[in-house]
C-alpha cells in the first residue's frame, strides 16, 4: 500500500522467546517475533516505529537492542530500566536508539516515585 504518507507504528511489542521473559502475574505472552511483526505490517508500508518493552521483559535489554539493530533507522526503543542504572548504561541505550523510558509502577518493579523522578531527570 503506497499512499504517499509516512506511517509510524507508535507502540508495538516484540516477544522473542530466544530472549529472557518473566511471567507477569502468571501471564507469558505468545511469541511475536520481529519476522512476525514484519509479515503482519508489511502490507501497510510502515517506515518506522517504537518497539516498547513489556513488563514481561523486565529489565532485559538484549531483545530490544537486537530488534533495533535489525530494524535500522526510523525505529526507536522504549524500555524499562532499574532506577539504579548507571549513566553509562543510559547513554549506551541512547546510542543504540532507545529514546524513552517507561515506568511500570504496578507490574514492572519500577521502584518508588522519588527514585523514579531522579532516574527520569538523569535520562532527560
PLM segments and residue spans:
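Active-site gating/metal-coordination segments in enzymes
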Residues: 58-124
